[in-house]
């Protein structure tokens, strides 16, 4: 969901997946809320809060607060492309064999692309890379891609892909977690 005005934009996303194969259940949560304030010449300031949990990576909750800025490289009635840079505070609780809680500061670089109001389809992508400022040799990445097709009568078919990577998880937890989804959505 999102809201745009002449200077402000707000976005919120919530994706939760539950997978059961045989008798093994796997949960994944990916949620965010962000705001941007448009300055002159398509520059902007931004803040964001992200929440993530993954049974695959043994993360009970990762909370990341980001502050930064960037520039819109494309900004018109049907598409936006932006790049951003800033700092992040990261707090994680892991459910590994030995429960671990970590707190760190990171530098982030990200980009977003959104194609909307096209005749038959929409595209959303959000990619962010993180380099830890307080932990040696730790890098993280988050990638989300959504492709939506208008199938008529306010219904959409949406293909989604999400990837989360951590170069240095605790206690030999998995470095990557990904999800591929196919959903049907509708507009009210």
Where are the regions a protein language model picked out?
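Repeated loop/turn-to-beta-strand initiation elements of outer-membrane beta-barrel proteins
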Residues: 6-12, 42-47, 77-81, 115-123, ...
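Residue-level signature of outer-membrane beta-barrel architecture
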Residues: 2-5, 37, 51, 71-73, ...
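Transmembrane beta-barrel strands of outer-membrane/channel proteins
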Residues: 12-18, 31-33, 47-51, 67, ...
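Detector for outer-membrane/organellar transmembrane beta-barrel domains
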Residues: 66, 78-131
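Membrane-embedded beta-strand positions in outer-membrane beta-barrel channels/transporters
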Residues: 30-32, 62, 66-68, 106-110, ...
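Outer-membrane beta-barrel "beta-signal"
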Residues: 176-188
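Solvent-exposed loop/turn segments connecting transmembrane beta-strands
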Residues: 4, 20-27, 53-61, 96-101, ...
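Transmembrane beta-barrel domains of bacterial outer-membrane proteins
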Residues: 1-38, 48-56, 142
């Amino acid at each position: 969901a999102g809201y745009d005005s002449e200077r402000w934009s707000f976005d919120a996303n919530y994706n939760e997946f539950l997978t059961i194969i045989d008798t093994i259940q796997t949960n994944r949560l990916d949620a965010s809320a962000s705001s941007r304030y448009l300055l002159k010449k398509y520059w902007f300031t931004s803040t964001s809060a992200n929440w993530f949990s993954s049974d695959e990576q043994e993360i009970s909750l990762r909370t990341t607060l980001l502050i930064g800025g960037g520039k819109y490289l494309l900004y018109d009635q049907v598409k936006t492309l932006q790049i951003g840079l800033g700092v992040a505070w990261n707090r994680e609780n892991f459910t590994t064999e030995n429960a671990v809680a970590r707190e760190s500061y990171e530098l982030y670089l990200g980009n977003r692309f959104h194609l909307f109001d096209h005749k038959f389809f929409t595209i959303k992508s959000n990619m962010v890379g993180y380099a830890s400022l307080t932990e040696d040799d730790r890098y993280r990445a988050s990638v989300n891609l959504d492709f939506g097709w208008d199938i008529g009568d306010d219904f959409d078919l949406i293909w989604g892909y999400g990837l989360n990577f951590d170069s240095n998880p605790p206690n030999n937890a998995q470095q990557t977690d990904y999800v591929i989804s196919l959903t049907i959505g509708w507009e009210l």
